Swiss-Prot record:
Function description: Catalyzes the formation of phosphoribosylamine from phosphoribosylpyrophosphate (PRPP) and glutamine.
Note describing how the cofactor binds: Binds 1 Mg(2+) ion per subunit. Binds 1 [4Fe-4S] cluster per subunit.
Domain Glutamine amidotransferase type-2, first and last residues per copy: 11-224
Active site: C11
Cofactor(s) essential for the protein: Mg(2+); [4Fe-4S] cluster
Catalytic activity: 5-phospho-beta-D-ribosylamine + L-glutamate + diphosphate = 5-phospho-alpha-D-ribose 1-diphosphate + L-glutamine + H2O
UniProt-recorded name of the protein: Amidophosphoribosyltransferase
GO MF term list: 4 iron, 4 sulfur cluster binding; amidophosphoribosyltransferase activity; magnesium ion binding
InterPro entries reported for this sequence: GATase_2_dom, Ntn_hydrolases_N, PRibTrfase_dom, PRTase-like, PurF, PurF_N
Length: 447
């Protein structure tokens, strides 16, 4: 099945030390399903590591028998990629230096290739092509020398560069860590046990007290007790696209609620680039919250002008024509847009092909004018820290002016949120915006 490559989150992770750990991990992964729909896995400890994983949605990979595995400790993972063999679905089991672990990783390493060559030169054999394996080997290599989880992770922080929030199942313990910059989110929860998740929305169902794992912080969960230490400090740079697109709206990351940040993006956009319109509509679902903010600030009524078909899933056999794909996923409400000046709000434009189809769809439904407003700045650069953004050549804003993009998509007007407006909306300057500015955090490339 052909896949149109767009901008996607790499994955989500979940871990728990508590009774009925496997079933709780299953529920947690379902809550993180938006972060990856192409593969899932759970690793447990009951005297040894056992891993169940497969391609597909969480509900497709696990059955009742697998959920009945007896264990009070488990980690899990959801991934987006359709490429690679089952051996590359996480958690990965890694064996090195006389030890073994299972590891789940959200992010991307920037020095994966030189590190892999280093360890291969030491005679260590790799069993996958994913960068996650390097983290596991780095940890086991250093642990074999120091016999201490914290010191081993301190050395990992010095050696491994890039974006990584990780959960490691090792010797009956869970080790959780977030890279010193804090690119990718990770949350700790405490209640009837100890929990970790990429987003706090995946922990809320368990009634826990939660907090962010700090950048450079490491947890070691050992039965009914835990210890945590901040082992490395760098200038924080939280991925801005977690707030723009990837995280669930009901999540709070780094003390900032995602829904409120997206709503403020719409407010800032309306202030910076007002439009004369009769109705504000969103590209569902990602543009909805910003569209509500835009409508409130502009005084233009918000209505649902595009309806999303929620039953086109991962296994749907897509037609070859791009236009038909968009029409299968989205349908205009003619009565909402016919004869109207429509303000269309979305979170971002990657290539521009989908937006072109949507604008035409609205015109075919009778829209008199279509004014496109994008609740983020233009994406001009690729991401090397865990978001699958296409190459720069494929990014329409990398090589075309905003006016050229407007003509390409067929809109009457086009405006993006500014960098400063985005910072105001999110409410922190500690953001990685490399895909928007081309300014990559120094630590991730200092090797």
């Amino acid at each position: 099945m052909a896949k149109v490559r767009g901008m996607r989150e790499k994955c989500g992770i979940f871990g728990v030390s508590s009774e009925d750990a496997v079933r709780k991990t299953y529920y947690g992964l379902i809550a993180l399903q938006h972060r990856g729909q192409e593969g899932a896995g759970i690793s447990v400890w009951n005297g040894r590591i056992r891993t169940i994983k497969g391609h597909g949605l969480v509900s497709e990979v696990f059955d009742e028998n697998s959920l009945n595995l007896a264990s009070n400790i488990a980690i899990g993972h959801v991934r987006y990629s359709t490429s690679g063999s089952l051996s590359e679905v996480q958690p990965l089991e890694v064996r090195c230096c006389g030890y073994e672990l299972a590891i789940a990783h959200n992010g991307t390493l920037t020095n994966f290739i030189p590190l892999r060559r280093l360890y291969e030169g030491m005679g260590i054999k790799f069993h996958s092509s994913v960068d996650t394996e390097v983290i596991g080997i780095s940890f086991l290599n250093h642990y074999s020398q120091v016999k201490d989880e914290f010191e081993a992770m301190r050395r990992v922080f010095e050696e491994v560069k890039g974006a990584y929030s990780i959960l490691i199942l090792f010797d009956g313990k869970i080790i959780a860590a977030r890279d010193p910059v804090g690119f990718r989110p990770l949350v700790f929860g405490e209640g009837d046990g100890y929990y970790f998740a990429s987003e706090d929305s995946a922990l809320r169902m368990f009634g826990l007290e939660t907090r962010d794992v700090l950048p450079g912080e490491v947890f070691v969960i050992d039965g009914e007790s835990y210890e945590s230490k901040v082992l490395a400090r760098e200038k924080h740079a939280y991925c801005v696209f977690e707030y723009i697109y990837f995280a669930r709206p009901d999540s709070t990351l780094n003390g900032i609620n995602v829904y409120c940040a997206r709503y403020r993006m719409g407010v800032e956009l309306a202030r910076e680039s007002p439009a004369e319109g009769d109705v504000v509509i969103a590209v569902p679902d990602s543009g909805r919250t910003a569209a509500l903010g835009f409508a409130h600030e502009s005084g233009i009524p918000y209505m649902e002008g595009l309806i999303k078909n929620r039953y086109i899933g991962r296994t749907f056999i897509m037609p070859s024509g791009r236009g038909l794909k968009v029409k299968l996923k989205l349908s205009p409400v003619r009565e909402v847009v016919n004869g109207k000046r429509v303000v269309l709000v979305d979170d971002s434009i990657v290539r521009g092909t989908t937006m072109t189809r949507i604008v035409k769809m609205l015109r075919d439904a009778g829209a008199r004018e279509v004014h496109v407003r994008i609740a983020s700045p233009p994406i001009r650069y690729p991401c090397y820290m865990g978001i699958d953004i296409p190459t720069r050549h494929e990014l329409i804003a990398a090589w075309r002016s905003i006016e050229d993009i407007r003509k390409e998509i067929g809109a009457d007007s086009l405006a993006y949120l500014s960098i400063e407006g985005l910072k105001r909306a999110v409410g922190t300057k500690n953001l990685c915006m490399a895909c928007l500015t081309g300014e990559y955090p120094e630590w991730a490339f200092n090797f």
